[in-house]
Amino acid sequence: MIPTADPILSFNPEALPPSALHMLSLSPKAMEKMSGISNPLVSPNAIPPRTSSTGIPTSLNATPTKPVLRPVPEGDWLSQKQLSPRAQMSNAGYGVMQAPNPPPDPERYAHEDLEFTAKRSWTDEKENVVRGPYDYVISHPGKDFRAQLIGAFNVWLDVPTSSLEVITRVVGMLHESSLLIDDVQDSSELRRGFPVAHNIFGVAQTINSGNYIYFVALQELHKLNNPELITIFSDELVNLHRGQGMDLFWCDTLTCPTEEDYLEMVGNKTGGLFRLGIKLMAAEANGPSPTDCVPLVNLIGLIFQIRDDYMNLSSKEYSHNKGMCEDLTEGKFSFPVIHSIRTNPTNLQLINILKQKTSDTQIKRYAVAYMESTGSFEYTRKVLSVLIERARKMAEELDQGRGSTKGIQKILDKMAIQ
């Protein structure tokens, strides 16, 4: 007898129709087979008696019974189900995705085209990947000082417009890509008020992007079909890396250079890119003997870097764009730092602050105050004033009374410290 779930309901077999009595007389296996044919969605097991929320049968008089559920092989149950069109479509797609691919045939390498030239396989998407860090840094432009310098010197050199555009573009590319490398080597955090590229793209990708643009710039120069330009390019890139190498060496070994060593380093590193642009212009200039502007541009390179060193330690604008006194955090022997250390070599406070490469603002303020006490900022201002006046006179001599020094004088005015 089937146990009842409710004591109020009584079971009377005589009240059931013959078909129902026949169903009750069937074995469980026969019942399963019949129910599977008539109803494909039927449960694989019989429904258990109704229970309370505690799991106890609702009938107080019900006697314990054996579990109604019985194990059913999964294959038997699933074979009874017929999937809906939507389910069939979903599973069909999944099956295609999961189907194993045939193993590749190694013999294909005997005849496949393996010439992956740039024209054949290099896409804009790939180019964007490699240029990513460079494109990021140029999206936050600086003051474009080098383009202004090229324009000022072109009054004397008179370079054809087409050549001048290429030279301006090349100098800009070299400058921006060198910043990518500088920021990695100096462990900088900010560039022009934004996070440095290597903190976004990673060190390796940033270095690769910077080096890549060096050679893209070289390809640009080839468009002018002037072998002299390639020689100038390679010479000044060598100088740039020589200067950078010495600057890094002094920081890494805590070696304070002399002012003469410092000026030589700046002439190679900072002056190198300035000189590169002017030399390229002279090689493309109209006329047989262009004005020799190299001595003046060398002097402007020194002025630019010494001023940059001064502003790094004293300017609020520099603090916003690069961080407060970033040169101290980098452990850099800048022009005011060199003067301060050599003014009193027995005082080791400043050189030990450089050794710490600290980001502590209180310590950096103390270092600045110490340099003030040694007269290093006043000395730097006086040196800048002397160099700027010397550059003005040199520009007038180059001009020879033609009245074409306005652009140079304007640049020198901007570099003067009031």
Curated annotation (Swiss-Prot):
Residue numbers spanned by region Disordered: 51-73
Cofactor(s), by name: Mg(2+)
EC number(s) given by UniProt: 2.5.1.-, 2.5.1.1, 2.5.1.29, 2.5.1.10
Pfam families: polyprenyl_synt
Keyword Metal-binding part of the UniProt annotation: yes
InterPro entries: Isoprenoid_synthase_dom_sf, Polyprenyl_synt, Polyprenyl_synt_CS
UniProt-annotated site: Important for determining product chain length, residues: Y214
Ranges of Polar residues composition bias in the record: 51-64
SUPFAM superfamilies from the UniProt entry: Terpenoid synthases
Assigned protein family: Belongs to the FPP/GGPP synthase family.
Biological role stated in the UniProt entry: Catalyzes the trans-addition of the three molecules of IPP onto DMAPP to form geranylgeranyl pyrophosphate.
The protein, known as: Geranylgeranyl pyrophosphate synthase
Organism whose genome encodes this protein: Fusarium fujikuroi (Bakanae and foot rot disease fungus)
